[in-house]
Amino acid sequence: MAKEKFERNKPHVNVGTIGHVDHGKTTLTAAISAVLTKVHGGEVKDFAQIDNAPEERERGITINTSHIEYDTEARHYAHVDCPGHADYIKNMITGAAQMDGAILVVAATDGPMPQTREHILLSRQVGVPFIIVFMNKCDVVDDEELLELVEMEVRELLSEYDFPGDDLPVIQGSALGALQGDEAWEAKIIELADALDTYIPEPERAIDGAFIMPIEDVFSISGRGTVVTGRVERGIIKIGEEVEVVGIRDTQKSTCTGVEMFRKLLDEGRAGENCGVLLRGLKREDVERGQVLCAPGSILPHTKFESEVYVLSKDEGGRHTPFFKGYRPQFYFRTTDITGAVELPEGVEMVMPGDNLKFVVELINPVAMDEGLRFAIREGGRTVGAGVVSKIMA
């Protein structure tokens, strides 16, 4: 039989498994792959392939992640699974694999454990919008009341972190049972797939958002004006539209008088494209790398924010020594480094390489930012940490 062509006709959604070590995240990932490929076709990935996750580098940090893909009735999914707890933290903070929703795996035999809580908290901090629960290992618990109790505990824990614990789907199943071909447990995997389709809304595509393009370079073209270049992060820019230049200095307004790509003139620049935008009335020295070009009023400059941060260990090429309050590294946002001072939380005296924690940063210059924006922490061009803006303060 000839290979089927990959059809881009279904909406695409990114998901991943989270939860405590040994609760069955990778087994569930393998079970989803096995059951859904049986129903909808595609390539099956087995446990060993998923568990043997390749190394990837994201913002100078090495992370092990496994990617699988599968289809449901309504959608195409890309699913990430990480082998180690540290990989999860790094993955979520760097946004290496951004999730539109997560499947929280909780073993019915254990109930919620420390990493269960930690992954829920991280999901809240880094902006994972939806969580679905898969209660695993239900085949070895024969006490109905115990299952109910565990489900109640998980729901309460999710509510504690502002997820709708009472309303979100909880599926009781057995990943191993499904992998072994037991029809009753396979049906629970199909139920999980239906929950993904119905509970996680279709994500807004980058092209539908308000226009924003981080500025990488600025040129002046005699007789035509100033051109800024960069990759459009989201939205569309059309000739004649008003734009703002935000960050580092006071916000300036301008109008787009031309868009070009590979030296060709275009009517518009779209999300994902590298292009040059010609700006009316601005001189070359008015604009610099590190600012962003955006739709008026869509993003504001800020200097103070709370962040969730992972500090690289010595083995990862990070610092060899801890840092203390008053630490002033550079924070690399999109295209530029800005110096900032770190304010450690109450009771934290020092931060060791390999730690992850929450701290407040005050930058010396404002940066265009929204909650959920990722950054790297650098010292003289070397990455020593990664973070995400969890709350804007000023």
Curated annotation (Swiss-Prot):
Name the UniProt key words of this record, in alphabetical order: Cytoplasm, Elongation factor, GTP-binding, Hydrolase, Magnesium, Metal-binding, Nucleotide-binding, Protein biosynthesis
- GO cellular component, as recorded: cytosol
Reactions mediated catalytically: GTP + H2O = GDP + phosphate + H(+)
Positions of the UniProt region annotated as G1: 19-26
The EC number(s) this enzyme carries: 3.6.5.3
- Provide the residue span(s) of the region labelled G5: 174-176
**What is known about its subunit structure?**
Monomer.
Q: What is this protein called?
A: Elongation factor Tu
